[in-house]
């Protein structure tokens, strides 16, 4: 199995990195826009241009606010992302021209060892190609390509060039839950920021015998997959760059890589998100959790180092979790001590349940009955003089489950009512641990019909 390619957007502030990021990822972001509490300031996302899927990172999210030199502003994670990405898109500003910061970043890129850098000259709309790009040749990074992130000009060609020879055919769709054999392995990614205890938990899961290492993958874009078994259930651990080889076995070490984390999330069936009970829920925690939600992966939360807290501290971390990660309210949450091996069995039980929920089959008759019962108890609000009418529902996909609702005047269903229906479907089908997406399809334009 190979990971999706990763595109890192690099450039000084205000050259349009966020605009390009939003254009590349907007179709995916729209799927989860209604989740309460989900940060709008996204740094990681799933992108697609035509039939080409990829992961995109806006490295601007890693830059401190400090007004020091541009190289000092670029955090360690930015430099790591530059080195580990499959391709770097270096954005410059056609209207501002080349400046000293651009030269410093170009020098950093040359020293990084990154072999694939595409120079994108943004804000080139209304300018001739020569006028927009000529002076950027002096950066020494090859041909500059004019684009307009705001208007979408040149984006398809830019990404096609960036991902040339990197794109592989998309994998076959995952099988239905009913078609999965009893010994089907759950692909599990354990993610979390540095020093949260991932390595301790992984070593506990792998057990005293460890696991025999087969041939290591040949390239960094291949996933390292480690099979293990607990309580008769088979799992495949997808590495997040925290495993090292010792002889013929792998041992987990505490290491963090944004790119490897995002790729492992993409490749998994279930994500185990680890938080540190002894530190605050960070922006990075929230961004990683948001990416999990965007990809539609089932998720279980484990709050580690719980054993060292008093009652007041435990109440504080629970309040903070509910406030900062309330968009993960569907995810089972456990408190554990990875070091002492406490609370691990319930976590894995939730992983199994979340996996089953992600691949659950939802029958059309039961979905429709539950829909009608929900509408009878709480009808959807009117849009002007029109009352939405929901006729029937059916399943449109799995991993995550997608429910498609058909009817009239459904174009303006508010997010609050969507969440109400989600709650009803979750309770009816026991869909704990998986995102649930709802799509409305109107049979006719509600503004051309009588109420």
Curated annotation (Swiss-Prot):
List of residues binding GTP 1: 11-18, 58-62, 122-125
Repeat among keywords: yes
GO molecular function: ATP hydrolysis activity; GTP binding; ribosome binding
Pfam name, any one: KH_dom-like
KH-like domain: residues covered: 360-444
Assembly and interaction partners: Associates with the 50S ribosomal subunit.
Name of the protein in question: GTPase Der
Any one Gene Ontology BP term: ribosome biogenesis
Keywords: GTP-binding, Nucleotide-binding, Repeat, Ribosome biogenesis
Family: Belongs to the TRAFAC class TrmE-Era-EngA-EngB-Septin-like GTPase superfamily. EngA (Der) GTPase family.
EngA-type G domain location: 5-170, 186-359
Organism, scientific name: Bordetella petrii (strain ATCC BAA-461 / DSM 12804 / CCUG 43448)
